[in-house]
Amino acid sequence: MAPDVRTKRVYDPAEPGDGYRVLIDRLWPRGVSRERARLDEWARDLAPSDDLRKWFNHDPKRYPEFRERYREELRAHTDRIDELRVRASHGPVTIVYGARDTEHNDAVVLAELVRAS
C-alpha cells in the first residue's frame, strides 16, 4: 500500500481524517495552543536547521535550492523518515507546518521523501 501522506497548515482545523499529525517546525507556531493543534508528535528533529530556515526566509525564488539543502539535512534522519513511511502505509499521516505558502515549504519536501520508496 502506498503511504498516505498529507500536508496541512497548523492554523487549519484538525480533522479525524488527518490521522497521525506531526508538526515539523522547529519553533512553536504563534497563536496556536497545543490543544488546538491536536498533534500526535512534534518532530523538531525533522525541521530545517535554523541557518537554512533563516536563509530561505519563505522566498519562493529560493525554494529549489532550499529543497535540495533540506533534503541533504534529512539524510541524517532516514530512520525517522522510514518510521513515518511505515506509519503512513497503515493510515493517514499529516505533516503539519506553520508557513503561509502551501507549495514552497518544508512539509512539502518531507512529504515527497516519505512517499518515495
Which sequence ranges carry the predicted segments?
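Residues lining hydrophobic/aromatic ligand-binding pockets adjacent to catalytic sites
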Residues: 1-117
